[in-house]
Amino acid sequence: MSQEPDRLFAQPLAEVPDFVFNEDVVRVFPDMIKRSVPGYPTIVENIGVLAGQFAQPHTTLYDLGASLGAVTQALRRHVRIDGCKVIAVDNSPAMVARCSEYLHAQDAMFQELLPVEVIEADILALDLQPTSLVTLNFTLQFIPPERRLELLTRIRQALLPGGALILSEKLRFEDAAEHELLTELHVAFKRANGYSELEIAQKRSAIEKVMLPDSLEQHRERLLAAGFSKVVPWFQCLNFASLVALP
């Protein structure tokens, strides 16, 4: 399936609109996220590997904020446990439609994959079934901060003993010098991947009001407040990280 290069912010815009996951973003999203998030392919593939350690027979696995289903595809590649099913959820109609296309293509290429259901829904209003694994891959940062604990508490209540939440997020840092350094290194990463200064600046203006990162300390405190017993960072590249939270 063809993928377009990300040129959404390549031309000067008189007014930069807030970032939304619309059809324009969907067309370039695979290229955008690979060139913008250091370590993204490693995170996605290893979520599948980690899932194989926590998924339990005859349970549901959730990919919340599934976007185009990269994590869902990784779960289906790596989890070989009887009776598991993946539910991929996103609130963007354009994302859901393209995600379904990608998963149909995966079905055509491979046999004996986990069954999957793709749902267009607000994850804050989703009725979660008992589950052995939930993934939030760069999703929580788009949830209103005042509702993040509520969502994590509901996930914790749905998790079965021995299950896990895998949470990946962009981080901010309490130490100003550390935050500035890692922000500069992230900009260098984007430059190295072909983004111009104009593209970087306009994308920042578009996303800074809708994506609100937390610090690692905030994530840990919130997860513990939601009822998780242990929080283990398993990956970090620059200001992007992934955690495993255990019930």
UniProtKB/Swiss-Prot annotation:
Enzyme Commission number, as recorded: 2.1.3.-
GO terms for MF: carboxyl- or carbamoyltransferase activity; S-adenosyl-L-methionine binding
Keywords noted in UniProt: S-adenosyl-L-methionine, Transferase
CDD domains membership: AdoMet_MTases
Any coiled-coil regions, as ranges: none
Keyword Nuclease: no
Highest rank taxon of the organism: Bacteria
Residues that coordinate or bind S-adenosyl-L-methionine: 40, 65-67, 90-91, 122-123, 137, 204
Family per similarity comment: Belongs to the class I-like SAM-binding methyltransferase superfamily. Cx-SAM synthase family.
Function: Catalyzes the conversion of S-adenosyl-L-methionine (SAM) to carboxy-S-adenosyl-L-methionine (Cx-SAM).
Subunit structure: Homodimer.
UniProt protein name: Carboxy-S-adenosyl-L-methionine synthase
Taxon lineage: Bacteria, Pseudomonadati, Pseudomonadota, Gammaproteobacteria, Pseudomonadales
